Amino acid sequence: MTILPKKKPPPPPDPEANGERSGSGAPDSHSRSGARPRSSPPPRWAYPGNPSSAAERHTQQVSPPPGSATSGGAGPLGDGALGSCCCCNGAGAGGCCSGPGHSKRRRQVLSAGPGATGNCPDTDDGAGNNSEDEYETAAQTQHLDPDTAEQQELCFEKTLSDKKGFIIKQMKEDGACLFRAVADQVYGDQDMHEVVRKHCMDYLMKNADYFSNYVTEDFTTYINRKRKNNCHGNHIEMQAMAEMYNRPVEVYQYGTEPINTFHGIQKNEDEPIRVSYHRNIHYNSVVNPNKATIGVGLGLPSFKPGYAEQSLMKSAIRTSEESWIEQQMLEDKKRATDWEATNEAIEEQVARESYLQWLRDQEKQARQPRKASATCSSATAAACSGLEEWSGRSPRQRSTAGSPEHPDLHAELCMKPPSPGAPLILGKPPSPCAPGPSNQMSTGADRATSPLVSLYPALECRAIMQHMSPTAFGLKDWDNDEILASVLAASQQEYLDTMKKSTLRRESSPDHS
């Protein structure tokens, strides 16, 4: 009979190995496509300028960390977590403590380690802070001189503005500064911080299987505490918001290059969310004024950053151009109207001056016929008296009066006075240069003293007046009385010519006898 050896009992299960197998096993059912690589938590950055030793920093913390371990490399929560370095306890391994990056598995292992002194339960003393990194930060905040701190802030703002062109927008210091800074760059209004916080906490709860590995306290308690509006934000929330808005989150701290960058799941060309970290307790928004970022990451279809501002600017420019064109057209119309009014005024002035000049000329011409008509009246009266004398004389006297020795008197006797009010129309007087017996017999003195010579200017003026339009004198048309007077004058002239011929015939007959 063969005796079989005793079967060795199976080795006790290693909690660390089980944890590693559970962490590296099948993918979680809650994980999404493009899942994050499971890696050890990232180390945290030590705040520069803190020369205290590891033991001193350990004694200064309000709530001691639950253990320490050397980090295995940079994780998905960024190139490095914010906060000051927390040294190892007991064994003094020379690595940096990863703070809130501790997983539950590592807490269990470290609590059972040789240098561990037991778990220190979390207290509510620092409920307003984040996880263990801000417990430490709150205890290790440097007490700088106010003047030095203000000078440092001013230098930081000036350097960032000169080299990068960025502007630091101050956020309200009420515990929600991180969410205010993100809301300012996503929504354009820091008062939307409550919406950003709610979305961030909901995202953390939906991905609790992943983010719970980087929280040192109960994850539900952590989320409930972070839902309070006065609770500070942490690098875990930054990573969640980077994935939620699919925009990188860059953190600047007294330098022109970001000290930490949190990336989303998918890489794109969207403008990152930039925040600045001040005095280890406050976040502000860092804005690029030359590039629009509001609305990026909200999932709006066909959204173009800054398109609304460009549309408003184009509309404002178009409105301004239209208003300017209308103003110029109005000015041109005003100038054209003034020019037309000036021309009309000039034309009216010229017409008025011309009319006044014409009235003066007419007045002068009217004065000259009056004098001539007075002379004509006296000459007519003399002719009438001569006719009366001629009619009262004897034939001998009449023959004597008609002799060639008195030609002027004979011409005056031949004139018959016109009817009063009727115009006197006579033929044009003979030219002085024309040959004829009358011109040879008359002298210059006789023509000057003859009443017929004085009638010539009046007759010429009257002929000119008859050829003029009646509207020049304010009349619509010539009256019939004028025409009748002209006919009567012509009849009188024929009568005088007949009398003259008969007289000459009578005078010539006695001479022949």
Swiss-Prot record:
Entry-linked SUPFAM superfamilies: Cysteine proteinases (SSF54001)
Region annotation Variable-loop: where it falls in the sequence: 226-236
Keyword Zinc-finger: no
Gene3D superfamilies found in the cross-reference section: 3.90.70.80
Top-level taxon in the UniProt lineage: Eukaryota
Region (Disordered) residue spans: 1-75, 99-136, 387-446
Entries under CDD domains matching the protein: OTU_OTUD5-like (cd22752)
Location of the OTU domain: 166-289
PROSITE patterns, sorted: OTU
Any single GO BP term: positive regulation of TORC2 signaling
Keywords: Hydrolase, Protease, Thiol protease, Ubl conjugation pathway
GO molecular function terms attached to this record: cysteine-type deubiquitinase activity; K63-linked deubiquitinase activity
Catalytic activity: Thiol-dependent hydrolysis of ester, thioester, amide, peptide and isopeptide bonds formed by the C-terminal Gly of ubiquitin (a 76-residue protein attached to proteins as an intracellular targeting signal)
Documented EC number(s): 3.4.19.12
Signal peptide range: none
Catalytic residues, chain numbering: 174, 177, 282
Root EC class: hydrolase
Location of region: Cys-loop: 171-177
Annotated spans, His-loop: 277-282
A Pfam cross-reference name: OTU
UniProt similarity note: Belongs to the peptidase C85 family.
Function as written in the Swiss-Prot or TrEMBL entry: Deubiquitinating enzyme that may function as negative regulator of the innate immune system. Has peptidase activity towards 'Lys-48'- and 'Lys-63'-linked polyubiquitin chains. Can also cleave 'Lys-11'-linked ubiquitin chains (in vitro).
PANTHER family per the UniProt record, alphabetical: OTU DOMAIN CONTAINING PROTEIN (PTHR12419), OTU DOMAIN-CONTAINING PROTEIN 5 (PTHR12419:SF4)
Protein name per Swiss-Prot or TrEMBL: OTU domain-containing protein 5-A
Encoding gene (name): otud5-a
